[in-house]
Amino acid sequence: MAFYNPHAAGELAARAYLLTFGQLSDVVAQEARRPVGNDLVLEGAVDGRWAAPSHVYETLLHLGEREGLPMFTITSLQNVEPTPPSAAYLRTMLDGLGEAFGWTADERVRYLLRAPGVAPAWTASRLGQLCNGQYRS
């Protein structure tokens, strides 16, 4: 699980999906393990932040606009101690970075090694093996 920290230094590679308000409401509900089908209530915003009905992702955050459309993410703004991600999670991240941005295996590995919690549990060599489908746990 990864969280977006709007106060962190550096750049963040991200992928966006065009959703209706109802679809966004359903994603938030699913992450909170609540029934879908009810639109979010976006009242009481503080600096573009709303409380989300989840114990993990407790904040719906307005990120700005792109091409005139609002961008949102759900995240946790709590101080969370980073832990090493699983091989399956990292493989998904590595594949997504290549697919979305066309990054080489080396670029993807270098990017993930800068992410909190990845190193020292994961080395460039092991991430490279994951990238190339050669990793064996």
Question: How would you name each of these model-derived features?
Answer:
Residues 1-137:
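Glycine-aromatic micro-motifs
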